[in-house]
């Protein structure tokens, strides 16, 4: 085998090996889809751990029989502190919110969101409508 053919074979093999090793990189071409299903009285998400600076595309579907809202909110006063708050106070805490008018039964709403920094303490996905949060309609998430 000539040196030229041997060199070409080595380069081709190295290129294939390097290409095969490069598949674990994060997809930076677009937002990360997050599918969220709301029901009575549950929140289920395809993603529960998020990174600051990454764009997430939330696809929120109300699979329940009553209207719900979807909020990303810091946990206050051990979580149940929301029980004594007005709706205006809850809305003011929201990092992101889709209102109950937008989420009647069967509705799907899509929204993009970027966690710009890690909020202090814990955060949750929440439906803060009267009685919904108290019935267990929240789900802890992490931003790391």
Predicted regions and their residues:
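Asparagine-centered strand-capping/turn motif at beta-strand->loop junctions
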Residues: 60-64
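N-terminal edge beta-strand
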Residues: 29-56
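Bacterial signal peptide processing site
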Residues: 22-25
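Bacterial N-terminal signal peptides that target proteins for export
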Residues: 1-10
């Amino acid at each position: 085998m000539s040196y030229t053919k041997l060199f070409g074979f080595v380069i081709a093999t190295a290129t294939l090996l390097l290409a095969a090793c490069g598949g674990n990189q994060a997809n930076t071409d677009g937002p990360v889809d997050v599918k969220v299903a709301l029901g009575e009285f549950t929140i289920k998400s395809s993603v529960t751990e998020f990174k600051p600076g990454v764009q997430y595309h939330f696809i929120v579907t109300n699979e329940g029989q009553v209207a719900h809202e979807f909020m990303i909110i810091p946990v206050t006063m051990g979580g149940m502190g929301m029980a004594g708050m007005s709706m205006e106070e809850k809305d003011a805490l929201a990092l992101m919110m889709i209102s109950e008018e937008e989420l009647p039964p069967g509705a799907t709403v899509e929204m993009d969101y970027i966690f710009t920094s890690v909020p202090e303490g814990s955060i949750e996905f929440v439906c803060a409508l009267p009685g919904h949060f108290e019935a267990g309609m929240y789900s802890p998430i992490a931003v790391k």
